[in-house]
């Protein structure tokens, strides 16, 4: 039986853990608390004064600013495994962190499954590469395409909050994100390595494949060299774009067929992700195009962009991928912000449609804006009427203008306050009241209908009549429905695709 260690933490509280290493990271050893509600991670080597000051700021300054004692502060606690305390033991510095939520550990995996076992962490790497997810992850652990969109939304939202605090992660990658594709959740880990304003950043520059090209280009320079590009918010943006691309498409955006240095694999990697970085789906420069005949069977179909192009992620994400990997790959100021990713992912989640093939592994797909929509994952064409709601709003009660925002309708789909009014947020600030559905959609007696549940202003602008709470309106082609007549209120115009 391991010995119980009792320490007094920096804030005077008692920390108790067993003297038995339960997990090891790149620079830390992890011990479990006696009640298994938290872990204590000790750096293997003594850390310098700068790192101590930086970690102290993370634990005692920024934690209190982000995790405020209110609804919004509690909301963020699910998004980060944030250090809560600092301890010293045997001349080494340790950080106290909450135990990961149980949803971030595999469960329900058959004992006969040879690869992943129950109790293993759901490290993001399992779900980012086609080879890993196709060979090693059981089908019932993969989640749907919509779940993966939600997962990416949580990551983008977490990074937006981090950046708003002036912090950068410095090593954002699939290794430092725990994910649960079954519930669409994600948690940012290794928060002790954050880049804190006015403090020297940690010496780690990131994980290969996620390091921004401009950082990789100067990695050989000493850390105090003014020409060295160090991790910061702008470099996080590159890593975030790569992470979203890999989680949705299960391939790396820069891993194409071009070999930049045939003699030195390290130089080849440095060029591939650094000075010569080139998007594998670049529309005009095919230099780094994927050579499908060189892919392993387990990398297909996801590894073949001609079969599953990035455009299957929808127009909002396609635009941001272009900015990240074409316009901004060697021009960091153009790379999309975490907020832009968050907003695009919210809109994309409203563009999804359930696949009509019950055996489809993805279950959902993004509407492709054609008259014959089909699931890109299994090839099943949509059959029947497909209603699309186009959102319009009137700035200062003027003429209604398009928002370039749509909502796909499917049976039992719900309408929320953030759909009816563009001033209502869909994020950590959404009130409990605004999280309640205000309407729902059904296929009833051969037609699609919208039932009004909680919108006092709903009005059929086509037939010039109010739609009271509890009443419904048919979704006919071209019908205009006012959802909210107040400031920010939206008008929807119905479009019907018949296939």
Predicted regions and their residues:
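ATP-binding glycine-rich phosphate-binding loop
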Residues: 2-54, 74-82, 88-90, 433
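Conserved structural core of kinase catalytic domains
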Residues: 78-147, 200, 205
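Activation of the activation-loop gatekeeper triad in protein kinase-fold domains
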Residues: 189-195
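Conserved C-lobe activation region of Hanks-type protein kinase-like domains
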Residues: 231-237, 244-318
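C-terminal boundary/linker segments immediately following FHA domains
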Residues: 459-499
């Amino acid at each position: 039986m391991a010995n119980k260690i009792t320490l007094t933490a920096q804030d005077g509280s008692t920390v108790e853990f067993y003297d038995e290493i339960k997990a090891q990271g790149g620079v830390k050893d992890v011990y479990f608390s006696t009640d298994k509600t938290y872990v204590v991670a000790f750096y293997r080597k003594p850390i310098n004064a700068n790192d101590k000051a930086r970690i102290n700021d993370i634990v005692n300054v920024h934690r209190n600013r982000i995790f405020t004692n209110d609804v919004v502060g509690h909301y963020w606690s699910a998004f980060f495994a944030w250090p809560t305390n600092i301890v010293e033991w045997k001349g080494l510095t340790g950080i106290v962190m909450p135990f990961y939520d149980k949803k971030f550990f595999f469960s329900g995996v058959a004992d006969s499954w040879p690869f992943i076992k129950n109790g293993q962490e759901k490290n993001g790497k399992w779900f980012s590469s086609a080879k890993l997810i196709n060979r090693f992850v059981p089908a019932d652990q993969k989640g749907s395409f919509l779940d993966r969109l939600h997962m990416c939304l949580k990551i983008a939202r977490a990074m937006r909050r981090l950046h708003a605090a002036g912090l950068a992660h410095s090593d954002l990658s699939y290794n430092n994100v725990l994910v649960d594709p079954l519930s669409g959740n994600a948690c940012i880990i290794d928060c002790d390595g954050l880049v804190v304003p006015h403090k020297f950043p940690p010496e780690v520059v990131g994980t290969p494949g996620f390091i921004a090209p401009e950082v990789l280009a100067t990695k050989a320079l000493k850390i105090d060299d003014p020409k060295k590009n160090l991790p910061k918010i702008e470099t996080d943006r590159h890593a975030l774009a790569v992470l979203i691309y890999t989680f949705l498409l299960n391939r790396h955006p820069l891993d194409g067929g071009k070999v930049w240095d045939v003699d030195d694999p390290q130089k080849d990697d440095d060029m591939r992700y650094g000075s010569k970085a080139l998007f594998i789906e670049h529309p005009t420069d095919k230099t780094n195009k994927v050579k499908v005949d060189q892919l392993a069977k387990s990398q297909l179909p996801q590894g073949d962009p001609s079969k599953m192009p990035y455009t299957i992620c929808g127009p909002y994400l396609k635009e941001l991928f272009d900015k990240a990997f074409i316009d901004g790959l060697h021009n960091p100021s153009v790379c999309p912000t975490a907020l832009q990713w968050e907003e695009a992912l919210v809109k994309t989640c409203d563009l999804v449609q359930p696949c009509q093939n019950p055996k489809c592994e993805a279950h959902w797909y993004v509407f492709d804006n054609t008259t014959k929509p089909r699931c890109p994952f299994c090839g099943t064409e949509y059959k029947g009427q497909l209603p699309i709601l186009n959102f319009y709003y009137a700035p200062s009660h003027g003429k209604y203008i398009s928002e370039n925002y749509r909502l796909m309708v499917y049976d039992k789909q719900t309408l929320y306050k953030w759909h009816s009014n563009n001033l209502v947020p869909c994020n950590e600030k959404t009130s409990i009241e605004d999280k309640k559905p205000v309407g729902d959609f059904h296929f009833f007696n051969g037609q699609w209908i919208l039932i009004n549940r909680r919108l006092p202003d709903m009005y059929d602008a086509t037939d010039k009549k109010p739609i009271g709470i509890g009443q419904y309106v048919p979704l006919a082609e071209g019908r205009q429905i006012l959802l909210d007549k107040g400031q920010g209120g939206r008008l929807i115009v119905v479009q019907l695709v018949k296939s």
